[in-house]
């Protein structure tokens, strides 16, 4: 899920009828790459008490989320609507990415009443009238030299504009932990996260270090795993982690402060037990 065709799939598969017949009233849908999204009795209770047909979870923005989609209110209809950055006019980009003007972003965790969704899908013959988003891609996402193509898609969260009684709810950052790039994967695999005995993320203030891996060597998962053969470095003491060039990491590497590795122009190695800081591989005297 994540794209708008999830609603058509639910309709055509007959799953909505099956769920209703089993006594289900609500659906929770999230992006499959959001590792923080999970059923919540607290959030579901808030949705049930709201009486709304549709609810979107939003979270506070950080600088890293400036380009994320946001829930705004339509001047024409007064309804909530999803605005992705690809849909923002160039003249409005600065305001749209200002976290003081738009402090929340769309997590794409949604809650919807099955009965209301069925009525809407029936009205539109199984295909909701969602705005089309244009994205530039390559035929092979792992090879930027392949043919350029235009991908047309719709966003699941855009359905918020079709429900007049739709609402938003602010949730903690722990409910939005997406893995879309290998930069995200570094954080999720690091010691900045801890699982409970129920294999859920521990509650906490999830302020992440800024990660920038050289896309020439780390963009694809095969290349990423080859260069982190043991595990990713410790990021517990890191504000940021930047890797320029082709570096392979040994065991028990620790990053601190604004850790930075420069491109040496050749394949390079971070030895076991090393400390990486602003000056590259450093001694452990910082402790």
Q: What kind of feature is each model-predicted range?
A:
Residues 1-67:
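Conserved beta-loop-beta/alpha segment of the NTase-like Rossmann-fold superfamily
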Residues 45-287:
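Left-handed beta-helix
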């Amino acid at each position: 899920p994540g794209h708008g065709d999830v609603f058509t799939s639910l309709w055509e598969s007959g799953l909505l009828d099956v769920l209703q017949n089993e006594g289900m009233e609500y659906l929770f849908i999230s992006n499959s790459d959001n590792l923080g999204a999970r059923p919540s009795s607290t959030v579901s209770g808030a949705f049930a008490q709201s009486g709304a047909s549709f609810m979107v979870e939003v979270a506070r923005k950080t600088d890293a989320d400036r380009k994320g989609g946001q829930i705004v209110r339509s001047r024409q209809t007064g309804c909530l609507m999803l605005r992705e950055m690809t849909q923002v006019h160039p003249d409005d980009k600065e305001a749209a990415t200002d976290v003081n003007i738009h402090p929340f972003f769309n997590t794409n965790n949604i809650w919807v009443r099955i009965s209301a969704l069925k009525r809407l899908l029936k009205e539109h013959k199984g295909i909701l009238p969602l705005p089309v988003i244009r994205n530039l891609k390559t035929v092979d996402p792992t090879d930027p030299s392949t043919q350029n193509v235009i991908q047309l898609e719709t966003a699941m969260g855009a359905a918020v504009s079709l429900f007049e009684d739709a609402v938003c709810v602010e949730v903690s950052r722990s409910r939005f932990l997406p893995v879309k790039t290998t930069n995200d994967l570094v954080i999720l695999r690091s010691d900045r996260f801890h699982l409970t005995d129920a294999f859920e993320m521990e509650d906490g203030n999830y302020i992440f270090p800024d990660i920038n891996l050289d896309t020439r060597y780390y963009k694809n998962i095969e290349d990423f795993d080859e260069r982190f053969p043991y595990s990713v470095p410790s990021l517990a003491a890191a504000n940021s982690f930047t890797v320029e060039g082709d570096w392979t990491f040994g065991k028990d590497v620790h990053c601190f402060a604004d850790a930075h590795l420069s491109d040496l122009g050749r394949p390079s190695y971070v030895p076991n037990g090393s400390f990486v800081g602003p000056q590259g591989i450093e001694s452990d005297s910082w402790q």
